[in-house]
């Protein structure tokens, strides 16, 4: 099964040993994505809506680079640092998935940096 590395134009390579996404057999796997700038600094500290929007925009770029759309997303893994942000995160999330929603889970946990509020990893199946 050949796989392709997906790095959207204009994005920097992660500073850890992973890539933004991979494509294999029509399936896009998007790495856990946070609201970081190109130097791994957290963007929009204390703003769960802005962080969620930024994260989902990055995910959309990865999927589009692979030839898909957000409608191809079948599963999201969502990690949040505080349940008080759940409604705000869902509000923005719903904007990116206006039709049929993908399956998902959401857990509260610590993230790699204290100001990071949400991380999302995604799987999308691109129609051939």
UniProtKB/Swiss-Prot annotation:
The keyword RNA-binding does not apply. It catalyses: (Z)-3-aminoacrylate + H2O + H(+) = 3-oxopropanoate + NH4(+). InterPro entries: RidA_CS (IPR019897), RutC (IPR019898), RutC-like_sf (IPR035959), YjgF/YER057c/UK114 (IPR006175). Its EC number is 3.5.-.-. CDD domains: YjgF_YER057c_UK114_family. Gene3D superfamilies: RutC-like (3.30.1330.40). Pfam families: Ribonuc_L-PSP. GO terms for molecular function: deaminase activity. GO terms for cellular component: cytosol. Keywords: Hydrolase. GO terms for biological process: nitrogen utilization; uracil catabolic process. Homotrimer. Involved in pyrimidine catabolism. Catalyzes the deamination of 3-aminoacrylate to malonic semialdehyde, a reaction that can also occur spontaneously. RutC may facilitate the reaction and modulate the metabolic fitness, rather than catalyzing essential functions. Belongs to the RutC family. This is 3-aminoacrylate deaminase RutC.
């Amino acid at each position: 099964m050949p796989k392709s590395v997906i790095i959207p134009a204009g994005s920097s390579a992660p500073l850890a040993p992973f890539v933004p996404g991979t494509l294999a057999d029509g399936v896009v796997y998007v790495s856990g994505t946070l609201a970081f700038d190109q130097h791994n600094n957290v963007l929009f500290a204390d703003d769960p809506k802005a962080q969620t929007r930024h994260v989902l925009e990055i995910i959309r770029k990865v999927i589009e680079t692979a030839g898909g759309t957000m409608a191809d997303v079948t599963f999201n893994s969502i990690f949040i640092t505080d349940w008080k942000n759940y409604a705000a995160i869902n509000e923005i999330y719903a904007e990116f998935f206006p039709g049929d929603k993908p399956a998902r889970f959401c857990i509260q946990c610590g993230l790699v940096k204290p100001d990071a509020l949400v991380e999302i990893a995604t799987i999308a199946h691109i129609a051939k």
